[in-house]
């Protein structure tokens, strides 16, 4: 049997564990372990208590920064106040409706997924500690109940109040606003007639076989912050959408700024029409070049160099023309990239038509009617209808003979007086040509916002996993507001920490700020002690995290 034995060496008392046994019939001991002095034993005992039994590491930086930003803007409070009745707000799983939607926004920004998968993701983050909820309780039913409590007619007012606060806090001076539309395909069954928003139409992702919803968005050109959005039926045209969206959105923006004459809305040719432009003021738009061939022929030979504030020099022509019954400023802008792409596309179409004509031959074994259909199909490629022409004859035996020729002058006209040219129209006569061009180019900020909203790694408006119009409206509100939070966070990262990179790169960097849950032995009965500790990080990441408030308080 083992026992504890004390012994001395050079006047110092030591302890060891020994075991008795008999050797050759005589009692003896063997040493099992040398324990050292009393101080050594006590120190080792205390170290054993302080060594964690378990270490759990979770991502903390991104969720902490977004949660702090949402708190600063009072996102949850604004939602709750908009839907409260008699100062009572629906609470599920210890969260109000606004708090649940904020959690959904943070999840949408960091790791887009279905509401059913939210709990599994939340367990890997510091979000449950930040918002004081139990992750397993936030099921898809939880989000369904909370989203159902938010009426569609309150969304615009909530968004406006939130944007007003952003403008105040960031001291924004709104000037040029970019407007654009896109669509998102859904997987809502055709037999489901309950929702009216999903409809079949031309889909920009090529999924014409699926029902889609449309999204109109206005962003600030300087900051790319979304200022207003509207969800609409998937089959509605861009022109009709613009006409219906314009009046309420301009009123909202006037209320936000108080100086409507300073606001200029920029939109592309898809929303331009005579009816839309007739009632417009303070705008820059593009119109379809095919409707202004004489103008292009005149301007193509008079393009002048225009230096932009970015240091780039472009070629453009400026004049005045009648647009929607009023005299407007017109700028014809040449884009080398557009010219190169259009010319390459034409050359590919010509090469394809030549191959098909060679396969067809001059004496095809077809009837005259069949030959005509085939030739018309070949001429259907872009621009070929004006370049290629043909004649069909039949001989005495009824055999078909065809003759095909091309219009070289038309080819030259397309290459020199049409390709690469954009026509811009504005009522901002006091602006310089460079200002008009830069305002139009700023319309790409709305397109960039749509790219982010379709990014499967963040925001990802689709797939929606919702099947009613009300849920689709609230889901889109969550996605757009998440985009607002991340864009604002990115703006602050650039300003406060000199961050260089995309919004996705910023979230990835902040996600690397991790928090450890250390479960310690206490040496006593009862629950083990749990403490939080931030993992070590490089100085650049720490600087970024501290600037954005992405390091959680552990007290």
Residue ranges and their predicted role:
Residues 1-99:
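Conserved glycine(s) in the ABC-transporter nucleotide-binding domain "signature"
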Residues 3-16, 24-28, 83-555:
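Anion-binding and metal-coordination hotspots
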